[in-house]
């Protein structure tokens, strides 16, 4: 099963995250299938590759709770519903 989850980058007190599609059985710092976006909690900025996120979700990828919240803030799910 593929999951959309956060992968931490940056140093102490300056953490940034990449939203990645990754096999659910691999560890957190494991090799990602593909990077689909990024999230900076300090600046509260989200960047996402919408077509790639939709591609993975349509094929059964499950976002983690945190990623789901981030994508809802970025209104990705609203765009996904409008598409179908």
Swiss-Prot record:
One of its GO terms (cellular component) is chloroplast. One of its GO terms (molecular function) is structural constituent of ribosome. Signal peptide: none annotated. SUPFAM superfamilies: Ribosomal protein S16. InterPro entries: Ribosomal_bS16, Ribosomal_bS16_dom_sf. Keywords: Chloroplast, Plastid, Ribonucleoprotein, Ribosomal protein. It is found in: Plastid, Chloroplast. This is Small ribosomal subunit protein bS16c. It comes from Huperzia lucidula (Shining clubmoss).
């Amino acid at each position: 099963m593929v999951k959309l989850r956060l992968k931490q980058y940056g140093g102490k007190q300056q953490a940034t995250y990449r939203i990645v599609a990754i096999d659910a059985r691999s560890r957190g710092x494991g090799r990602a299938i593909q990077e689909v976006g990024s999230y900076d909690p300090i600046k509260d900025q989200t960047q996402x590759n919408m077509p790639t996120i939709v591609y993975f979700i349509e094929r059964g990828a499950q976002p983690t709770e945190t990623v789901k919240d981030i994508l809802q803030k970025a209104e990705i799910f609203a765009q996904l519903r409008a598409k179908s």
